Amino acid sequence: KMTPYSENGSPLILPAKVSKQSYRPAQSNIPNDKQVRVFLKKLVSNYVGKTGVVPPIGIKELREHAVAVLKEARLEGKYENYTAILVSNQAWRDTLAQIPYDRRLLLLPKCLRVEERCPAPFDEFGLLCKECGLCSIQDLSVEAERLGYAVLVAEGSAIVRQMIETGKIEAVVGVSCINVLEKCFPHMEAAAIPGVAIPLLQDDCVNTTVDLDWVWDLIHLTSDDK
């Protein structure tokens, strides 16, 4: 391959290829239109600021807030669980921002990979990314590790509980389907660990997609962002 050069003769450093997700429609209990999801997220941000919601929040209270937001948004009640996650994220946002990167865990699901072409093996902790560039797992995990995060590409609530119990993790940034997030919630609530979660747009466990810009935002979140 020829190396490209700038006008002054120095070699150009090209950015790494950014992996793209194939478009897939969202499951029925998540708004399919990205603009609607962004609108809902902004509405949640305003609502939490206005009502002064303070974490940790029990699941019953979260659902009440979600119902209030959906009523204001004039959106269907089937989005209640999704909206409850957005409310919880917004409530924990300032707390997460205060926690150093090296005390945070990034938890990614293996189903973000391109399953039929992924070369990565598994061990007892989860997927061992080979950094092939086919999916977003490489970009997210490499950047998070550069910042100081512990990173796991694994499923389920048991891993989260184990990491919390080590005492080395003070916050969790997770990407997962709504079903798994609901199972993890009691462990997070019991430990009063700040946890933010970006829901996968599908829960069928194969070649799933996520709002990647939201994941990047939360990975980089610091107190300097205020």
Label the model's feature ranges.
Residues 147, 191-193:
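Short, structured coil segments at secondary-structure junctions
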Residues 1-110:
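Electropositive, gly/pro-rich neighborhoods at or near active sites that engage anionic ligands
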Residues 168-169:
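Proline-aspartate-enriched helix->loop->beta-strand connector
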Residues 96-149:
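Redox- and metal-dependent alpha/beta enzyme cores, enriched for Fe-S-associated oxidoreductases
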Residues 108-109, 152-156, 173-178:
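Short His-Asn-centered micro-motif
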Residues 156-165, 180-181:
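A short, acidic, amphipathic alpha-helical segment used as a generic capping/interface helix at domain edges
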Residues 163, 182-187, 204-211:
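Short, charged, surface-exposed secondary-structure boundary motifs
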